[in-house]
Amino acid sequence: TSEIAQELADKYIKGLLGYSYTPSDPIPFVDVDGSPLGYIVPVVTSNRAAGYLVLDASDDEILTGYRFGDGLVSPMDRGGDLGVESYSFNNPVVMINPFEFGVQSLDGSITTNCGRTIPAVSIEGRPVVLSNKPSSWNDVVIYATQMQDYTVSGFRSISQFMSYDESEIKRLTAHYACMVTAFSNVAELYGIANLYSDPSQYMQIWNYTNTHALSDEEQTVPGVVLGGTPISTCATGFTNYCASRGSTLIARTVSSPAIASIQNEINSNRPNVLHASLYNGSAHSVTAEAYATLTGKKTGETRQMIGIADGWNSSLSFLKYDQSYYAWTYGTTFSK
C-alpha cells in the first residue's frame, strides 16, 4: 500500500540523508503487462524537491533505485506533459526499466520521462536473442523497448543517469564520435560541461582526445563529420580537458576490466567509459552507469548486465559484458 511505501521510504531517507528530508506522496507503478510493481516516492526538504526513491516489491532488495539532489524531481515530474496530472487508475505509470517510466495512452503507446514515445507494437512481448557470436551491437545490447521481456533484479546505479542522444549531438555540433559522446556524459555528470548550454564543449573534448575525422568513404551522414578516437590518448586527453575547465578529475584506462571492477565503480557513484570491439571490427564506446541481473521471462535465462548510455539513445540500455563476445575491451575510470 502507499502507506507502507511511505513508511519504508521514510526509513531509507532518514538513513541516507538525515531527518530534514521527508517522503512525499508515493506514485504507484506497474510493469508493461499491467501488474502492480511498486512506488516512486518523491523526496522533499523545506518544501523543495530533493530526489526520489524507487521501491519495487518484485525485487528482494525493495529499494531498487534512488537519486538525490537539490531541485531533482521524480521521473513523473519530467518531460513536459508527462507530469502527475497525466496518469490515473486507467492510465497508470509503467516502469520500462529502473531509470525510465511512462504513461500508457489509449492507443497503447507509452510516453516516457525520457521524452520517448514507444509504439504499442514495440511493447508487445517478444523474445530477444543475444548471439554468442555477435556480429552486430544489436546482438549484445538490450534496448529500453525490449525490457518488457526481462525481469530486473539487483539493480544498482550511480546517483543520476545521463545519456546524450546521437541525433541531438549531431544537431548541436554537426559532429559525432561515440567516445566523445561517452566522455560528454561524464563531463555532464561531474558538472564540467553541459552541451545544451555550450555545444562547443563537445569539440573541446574532441580535440583534447585527438579525435580525428573518419575517411571520406566512412562519412555516411550528410552535413555531419563522423570521428574516431584513439584509446591510447583518450584518458590523458580527457584529463587535460577537465583541467582546462578547472576540474581535478583524472581519467585512467585499463585493458580488459572485470565486471566486478565496473560494478565497484558504480557502487562508489562513479561512471565508467567502456570501449569494446566485436570480432568483425565494429568498435564502440559507452558510458556505464548501472548494473543489474536480467532474467528472460520466456527463457528463464539469467544474465548479469551493465546499464549503459549506449551513445545512440537517451534512455538506459543494458550491455551483455562477456569478454568472449569481444576481440578486446578497455575501461576508463575517473577519480579526483
Language-model-detected regions and their locations in the chain:
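Active-site-adjacent structural segments surrounding the nucleophilic cysteine of cysteine proteases
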Residues: 6, 10-22, 65-102, 106-227
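Exposed beta-strand-loop-beta-strand "reactive/processing" segments of non-cytosolic proteins
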Residues: 16-58, 94-110
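Generic structural motif
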Residues: 20-26, 87-93, 247-254, 331
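Residue-level detector of short, conserved catalytic/binding motifs and their immediate flanks
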Residues: 39, 51-53, 176, 286, ...
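A short, sequence-level motif marking secondary-structure junctions
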Residues: 56-60, 115-119, 123-126, 291, ...
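Active-site signature of cysteine proteases
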Residues: 60, 78-108, 259-260, 267, ...
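Predominantly the structural core of cysteine protease catalytic domains
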Residues: 176, 184-185, 213-294, 298-301
